[in-house]
């Protein structure tokens, strides 16, 4: 199954699961007018095809006192050390997103911290990585929205 093999039923099932991954298949089936078995089989096919990679929780980090979000551009001294640096960054729990980029920086990451002192500590930890030549930090003053599943609304079937 490829993206082009999704039909309207698959897309509607995805819409329900994107809204709430814990929606029972029977509830999805009832709302769609199909059997729960059909929902189960189609979800399994989308999982097998790698379209559905699992389910996850959305955590409100502000409720856990992680109120400070910073984006960090990382310039490496040697670009052939990118994978090595990514592994090190992956080991820092406050680094919540990592991307290899073109342009001014080799790597771009998102960090969540409790406050400016916590963010400073994490940025210093990143700067201490041997292959890191320099970093540039951008403080998020407001997260307007964060929706990793938003694109599904634009996928055409």
Name every feature range the model reports, one short phrase each:
Residues 1-157:
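A compositional/biophysical signature of low hydrophobicity enriched in polar/charged and small residues
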């Amino acid at each position: 199954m490829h993206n082009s093999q999704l039909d309207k039923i698959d897309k509607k099932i995805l819409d329900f699961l994107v809204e709430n991954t814990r929606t029972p298949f029977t509830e999805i089936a009832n709302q769609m007018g199909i059997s729960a078995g059909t929902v189960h089989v189609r979800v399994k096919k989308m999982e097998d095809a790698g379209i559905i990679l699992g389910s996850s929780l959305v955590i409100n980090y502000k409720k856990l006192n992680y109120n400070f979000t910073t984006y960090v551009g990382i310039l490496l001294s040697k670009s052939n050390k990118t994978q090595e640096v990514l592994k090190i960054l992956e080991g820092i729990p406050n680094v919540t997103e990592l991307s290899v980029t073109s342009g001014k920086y080799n790597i771009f990451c998102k960090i969540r911290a409790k406050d400016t002192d916590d963010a400073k500590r994490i940025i210093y930890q990143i700067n201490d990585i041997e292959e890191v030549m320099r970093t540039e930090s951008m403080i998020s003053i407001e997260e307007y929205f964060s929706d990793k599943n938003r694109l599904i609304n634009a996928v055409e079937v």
